[in-house]
Amino acid sequence: MNSLVKGISKVRSTRSFSTVSMSPLEPNKKLNYEGIDAKLKQFRLHHNKPLTLAEKIIYGHLEDPSTKVERGITYLKLHPDRVAMQDATAQMAVLQFMSAGLPETAVPTTIHCDHLIEAYKGGEKDLEVAKDINKEVYDFLSTSAKKFGMGFWKPGSGIIHQIVLENYAFPGGLMIGTDSHTPNAGGLGMVAVGVGGADAVDVMAGIPWELKAPKIIGVKLTGSLKGWSSPKDVILRVADILTVKGGTGAIVEYFGSGVESLSCTGMATICNMGAEIGATTSLFPFNKRMVDYLNSTGRSNIANAANSFKHNLVADPNAHYDQLIELNLDTLEPYINGPFTPDLGHPLSKFAESVKTNNWPAELKVGLIGSCTNSSYEDMSRSASVAQQALDKGITAKAKFTITPGSEQIRATIERDGQMKVLEKVGGVVLANACGPCIGQWKREDVPKGEKNSIITSYNRNFTGRNDSNVNTHAFVASPEIVTALTIAGDITFNPMTDFLTDKDGNKFKLTPPTGDELPSRGFDAGENTYQPPSPNGQNINVIVDSESSRLQLLQPFAPWDKKDLVDMQVLIKVQGKCTTDHISMAGPWLKYRGHLDNISNNMLIGAINSENGKANAVLNQFTGEIGPVPTVARDYKKRGVNWIVVGDENYGEGSSREHAALEPRHLGGKAILVKSFARIHETNLKKQGILPLTFANPSDYDKISGDDRISIIGLKDLAPGKQLTLIVKSAKQGSEFEIKANHTMNAGQIEWFKAGSALNYIKSEKAKKN
């Protein structure tokens, strides 16, 4: 036994955790701290080095703890503790799970109805409308949950990540979720990773989940937050430093004395928005604030177990980080990020100058607080303290104001404790416990579509047109306290640290910094019961999908590779600049088709900018000579038997975990995506669906390709891990051809997915062999 193992063995508790449930809602599913401990002990026999916290959790979930691991290189086979899915992505995941022919999920799994509720009139009215128009989907998900042994959170329950934090997250756990902001659970010391539905199906089927061993970025926090600064400002500053792709392939691990000054939900906020820097996930070490939160949410037994296991819930001394960032919270001022990208950071003291310099609209039209990022009790309390100051001076918000509680528990508690009343009095409209405007589910009517305007949110993402489908809406992201202050002022250049407001009598006054309890002194009010527990016996339940439905469609397997090179693929579109999953598969009004692959494919790449003409959703059909919508042209190529390819820029597929952005191109005849670089989740999703995700060996080759060229990929029979591919480009404009090289990151197993036509096809074929 090496010295590290000996040292750690001395502090191990002999206590058994096998009687402690992972969640009060799942009494028969137990913590496996002993199993993690045993695997780490075996892992250390082969790796005599200090480990980061992220490494401890990940390596403690390895299928084979004797695996030799090299960060950024080795593909790990892992066994997560649980799966969480939101209703928009769950539809396709459940349809895929059904086609696998398995009786029940192998790990605890939950479905959360939060994405399909459109914000319009207010919470109760919007919820009733959603229940009516989405009844078919909700019934499908509810029945599927009963049949396959999954927990089901009904519409109105709240946002998936808040529900997970309140009920399921635990220190040292490993979870995957079909939403990019799954890392929210890192606020409770959990490695929680956003994935596509096909990855979720693997885990639900009991198949090891594959993840390339991430690099580790350390963020050392010192000092403590003061005044108007909040946990949100930590991640806004980190995003400003690392940019939207700076965390790609890495886990962001926070540590240092400054951690102790952050609430558990504040740490969750920071981890949540790690998705905006492309990080695999983010997390914090186990500490007293996590214990406080676990105790307040009815999980004292987990807090006690974690305390006995804490040697594996913090990094080893002298653990190595691939990159180190240091932030002094004493001097961190509030940040406002945006517009159009979450990594364009502005210290509050300089923001007004940026607004003036860039000619952004200074008048604030709407302020929106809440979302999965900032809808905790503390967030609502601090925002209400700002609103109360305005009310005390006889004024209300000059801009429109919306409030989204993160869960039914938060809604009921702030209603009981008075924060909701204060926020409503200042002019706020309380929306349903759901995602709403954060994901584009917002029926906005205060400005005409296309009008240049500014909004500010406490959300996480502010891509062009994301919130309201208006490409001229300048969306800025800040803490809920700052959003509330600016909404009262009606001006995005207002700085509450220095500027004055005018009371009802015309007197000037300045807002004092926000205050608010981290947790309710009287405990949480659970509110209405919106939970459907897993059924103990669902074998006799039938899940029916109407063949005439416009919302749901059973999946047909994709065709396997025909063992031939991909010759003369037509470039469907050469994408110019940023191309997020919102550009590839828009949300908003399209969310209702998330369970119907053919219908939702009509939104494929309609937001991407065509480099040939600078327009969105306008590409030249090379056979008809006519300009048409991208999906229409793709369907025509497929009908003609012509394979096609997409050419893109940097960080292609940035944003959400939606696998529809990979399913749609596959469904409409796409064979490969060739770009300068990929966002992690999207690249994996493409592999899962049998599409070749390729990157230029020489990024400047992007400029050599035109939107009307044809591309051949040769030598596919020799496709192997780490081996470059040769592409032949036939230039339509020049009448010549040239050769370029492309890289890929597929390992041997992923190459088998390509050959089988998809990962699901491969799973089914392997299962058939065993039977």
From Swiss-Prot:
Binds 1 [4Fe-4S] cluster per subunit. [4Fe-4S] cluster binds at residues 372, 435, 438. It comes from the Eukaryota. Its cofactor is [4Fe-4S] cluster. One of its GO terms (molecular function) is 4 iron, 4 sulfur cluster binding. Its EC number is 4.2.1.3. Belongs to the aconitase/IPM isomerase family. Catalyzes the isomerization of citrate to isocitrate via cis-aconitate. Monomer. This is Probable aconitate hydratase, mitochondrial. The gene is aco2.
